[in-house]
């Protein structure tokens, strides 16, 4: 069935962590993890977190406890207070404020062919952050777990987004970066899904994946043929 609507995750899909804000407590200790190490930890944590969520119940934010615990162990500073502060910073939408060049332009192009929406596990303020970053007006609907009261992968947040825009699940495609949260959550309500896999955590999983919005445009062009 033809795709009418595209929905996007925000963190690590449309917006990315501002390292200066996110890693402030490490920088205060004169610890500056490399981007290569952060990508490696992200890949490893996603694979571990997916396995955990598929066998138990866990919320999306539990990912960051695992991520920073692993990172701090790798850095040789396994401090619980530092870990808690780092995790808390991921739960503040304003710290997700880095945007890739060309994001608005790609969204505007996609918006000429599809209806666009957002589904994000956030703190009720994600619409303000998207506006601050200059892309809120690209979306017809913005669904925030802090407002809905349910986090991905719970079906209710996906269903709320579909209802808010009046679109059918089978005519919608969702793009997000965590398999167990975004892929399993969206497909459980009948949506199609493409993983936004900048860290290459799912390169060997055999699922639809892209590493940029431009990749998504190309993939959709192929699907529409």
Roles of regions detected by a PLM:
Residues 1-10, 36, 79-82, 104, ...:
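Asp-based, Mg2+/Mn2+-dependent phosphohydrolase catalytic module
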Residues 2-104, 108:
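N-terminal helical cap/lid subdomain that shapes the substrate entry/recognition surface
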